Amino acid sequence: MIKLLYPEFWQKRNIIAYLLLPISLIYQFLGYLRASLARPIMLPAKVICVGNCSVGGTGKTQIVMYLAKLLRAKNVSFVIVTKAYGSNLKSATTIHQGHTALEVGDEGVILAKYGTVIATKNIKEILPLINELKPDIIIIDDFLQNPYFHKDFTIVSVDSQRLFGNGFLIPAGPLRQYPNKALDTADLIFLVSSTNDKIPNILTPYIDKLINAQIIPSSDVDKTKNYFAFSGIGNPERFFSTLKNYGLNITGYKIFPDHYNYLQADLENLYSLAKEHNATLITTRKDHIKFNDLNNNIVCLDVELSINNPDLLNEKIFKKAQIFN
């Protein structure tokens, strides 16, 4: 799997973005071809698909966690399906307590604390496991652009700072698809931020299905210490912003590629950097779980989703998905 950082030209167009446009056109054509030839299957349960239009972290994992807690509180049986990014997974599997991030993906390990999770790289492989588990609801993390299964309810997650970047498709820009169709057909749109940002103009036509959501800390961290932050997630800038908004003194930071699998040498280098800054290492839950087999003394900041209008979420999901029917 190719792991890339989010390049600057994905946010603001420059000569590199324009030079890559011909490849983006090929990407667009292949996407249209794939969609036109696909014959979507009907999964044996209602499907809630959480996805985004662009590469990089937009808060999908936190949205799935929120949905899982909501359904569990309503005593609704559900299964989460996750894409197993950054793992060596060969076939679809139900995650158990002993699985590692390298085996099933970092997101799968985290989400398994909230319910039954199937990790897969091919959506078609989940059917036997779904038939065995017999859930009422299937929450699918990502796969928004996958045309091979029917979606009953779609949630599009949008990062409030990056939005849709420079507006170009991969690799000239960050977009997996142009946002117009995704936003028009979405049942809900989550505008995710680390602060209470204003609604951007591009989303004002969708105000009736827009939910403002904030990523907020859910664990206590000693605010008297200095911290050196690092992360290998899709949107590290939002993590660093969350740390500062929480009132932590961040003396430095290091960014790794998304879904990065850390080595002992990386850990030693990070400890050296922290010592230079007279600081304690701090990172995300997605990164922290990858140090299970390495001696470490790294602080983990857990985060969760806070939304401004939960009634809209409840009304839309329980009405459209017809959970109790």
Curated annotation (Swiss-Prot):
PANTHER family from the UniProt entry: TETRAACYLDISACCHARIDE 4'-KINASE, TETRAACYLDISACCHARIDE 4'-KINASE, MITOCHONDRIAL-RELATED
Reactions catalysed according to its record: a lipid A disaccharide + ATP = a lipid IVA + ADP + H(+)
Residues the entry annotates as binding ATP: S54, V55, G56, G57, T58, G59, K60, T61
The protein's role, per its UniProt record: Transfers the gamma-phosphate of ATP to the 4'-position of a tetraacyldisaccharide 1-phosphate intermediate (termed DS-1-P) to form tetraacyldisaccharide 1,4'-bis-phosphate (lipid IVA).
Annotated GO CC locations: plasma membrane
HAMAP family according to UniProt: LpxK
Record-given protein name: Tetraacyldisaccharide 4'-kinase
UniProt xrefs under SUPFAM superfamilies: P-loop containing nucleoside triphosphate hydrolases
Keyword presence, Lipid metabolism: yes
EC number, UniProt record: 2.7.1.130
Membrane-spanning segments: none
GO molecular function, one term: ATP binding
